[in-house]
Amino acid sequence: MPNVPLIQAALGQAVTDGVFPGAVLAVRHGGAAIDVFTAGRLSADEAARAVLPATVYDLASLTKPLSTVTAVALLIQAGRCQLHDRVESILPELAGSPIGTASIWHFLTHSSGLPGWRGYYERVSPNAAIPATEEDRRRAREAVLRMIRDEALIYERGARSLYSDLGFLLLGMIVERCSGVPLQEFFRDQIASLAGTSQLGFVPTEWADNFLQCARRRGSDVAPTEHDTWRGRLLCGEVHDENAASLGGVAGHAGLFGTAEAVLTVTGAWLEAYHRRPSVLDALLVKEFTCRQTVVPGSSWALGWDTPSPPSSAGRFLSEASFGHLGYTGTSVWIDPLHELEIVLLSNRVHPTRKNERIKAFRPLIHELVYREYVGDS
């Protein structure tokens, strides 16, 4: 049996040490009941409410595997696209551009040649005028698509990997073109609904106020992120990532909000398929998506999922078959299929400022502790 007080104490000590104002840690081992640990408060304000298991966090780049990668896998299963389809065959606006001949596989492995990040939001929404309707979001997506079309590649495609939000911006658009519906609707109907959760989803700009009110009526709260200088306010219930915000809160690289237990509904679908048990995902495809793509020199990436490579946020003990992802706001998920161990850490380490990077040292320590307590010494 895991030493629950020891794990709880470690999470509480992280709050004391200023790693984050509060956090939720959810662990599932061997398909057993989920253990949820909480510590701290919603914000740095001493009067703030305590974090609860139902606290909702901005998941940041966990959007990539939970939404975009899962959506791509489902679309491949349905025959709507293939891993090696060229992006220009799906987004003809990119025909003739430097990135046009890259494939879905290149974006999933972060080996497309695109830069890692660009501040497109400064051009799309120069006055922080966030799109508030589907038509506004469509125009913003078209503007971002043109900007990516005009990007010069900064390394030879496939020669190495460079973690890129730009590639996942395109993957989000690919999901919409191949499915024929907005990304938030595809996620709601084809992923969250089938996984059996209503506590995980995108928050388009016009839904933000209602989202906060609904969360509170359910007895949960939304953890704030940063005092954002671009938008001139404390962010709570609206996406922290500026490029995602400039697209109206819905994008392939960021935008999901949810609870730790809700995250486990999606990771559980991946784990079940990995072991050829009933799942919405195809077992062979899941094995391919979670296997490190060694054809890219020096890369730790599988298809949209990362794999452990020292020094890793996963710590030293998770098996080589493990896969996971990090989120900039202070979130992470790691899945060890050989030990059937799923670990979700949600926090708002960027509150009140993104300059706090203490979580980098904490992540491997908490993953090692959880492994020892649930699996045993390694």
Show where each model-derived region lies:
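Short, gly/Ser/Thr-rich active-site loops of penicillin-recognizing serine hydrolases
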Residues: 272-275, 281-293, 310, 352-378
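Short, surface-exposed loop or secondary-structure junction motifs
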Residues: 97-320
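Short, conserved catalytic-motif segment at the N-terminal edge
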Residues: 2-59, 80, 146, 241, ...
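Hydrophobic (often cysteine-bearing) scaffold residues that line and stabilize catalytic clefts
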Residues: 3, 7, 59, 63, ...
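Short active-site loop at a secondary-structure junction
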Residues: 13-26, 46-106, 155-166, 251-254
